[in-house]
């Protein structure tokens, strides 16, 4: 099908399109590493979770989270109950809902979506992208 719209210029393209591998990386400690991208009211965190790792149960006050399992598998613990999840599964966590995970032997890649932004991750992002003095 023929396109009638003009092609976006490089500057326009760069404002709208990002590649995960070129997004800034932050260290999440035992949770792995993450590439972060932010919209005005949401945050995308592409997380590489190491094999056989454990993400301690935690909560995000006033923040909703969606977690999409892109690759691998894990057993998520939500409010004290175990939820085995696999590639293609999506978890939804309400504000202040406790969650953690036991990652499988092959590790996992997940996409966490936060709304609003997590200030702690924004701070790590700022440190990771700021020039050292």
Task: Name what the model sees in each region.
Residues 1-41, 125-133:
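A short, N-terminal "cap"/entry segment at the start of jelly-roll beta-barrel domains
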Residues 20-57, 63, 112-113:
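A short glycine-rich, His/Asp/Glu-containing loop-to-beta-strand
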Residues 43, 73-75, 82, 98, ...:
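Structural motif
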Residues 47, 67, 91:
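Conserved GNAT-family N-acetyltransferase fold
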Residues 51-52, 88, 96, 106:
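Tight coil/turn sites that cap or link beta-strands
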Residues 62-74, 79:
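Glycine- and acidic-residue-biased ligand/ion/polar-headgroup-sensing regions
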Residues 95-120:
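Ligand-binding loop in jelly-roll beta-barrel domains
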């Amino acid at each position: 099908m023929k396109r009638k719209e003009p092609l976006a210029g490089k500057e326009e393209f760069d404002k709208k399109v990002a590649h995960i591998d070129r997004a800034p990386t932050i260290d999440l400690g035992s949770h792995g590493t993450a590439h972060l991208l932010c919209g005005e009211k949401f945050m995308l965190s592409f997380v590489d979770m190491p094999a056989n790792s454990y993400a301690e149960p935690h909560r995000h006050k006033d923040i909703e989270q969606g977690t999409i399992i892109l690759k691998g598998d894990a057993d998520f613990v939500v409010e004290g109950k175990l939820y085995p999840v696999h590639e293609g599964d999506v978890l939804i966590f309400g504000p202040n809902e406790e969650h953690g995970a036991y990652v499988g032997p092959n590790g996992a890649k997940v996409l966490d979506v936060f709304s609003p932004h997590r200030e702690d991750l924004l701070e790590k992002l700022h440190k990771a992208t700021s020039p050292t003095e």
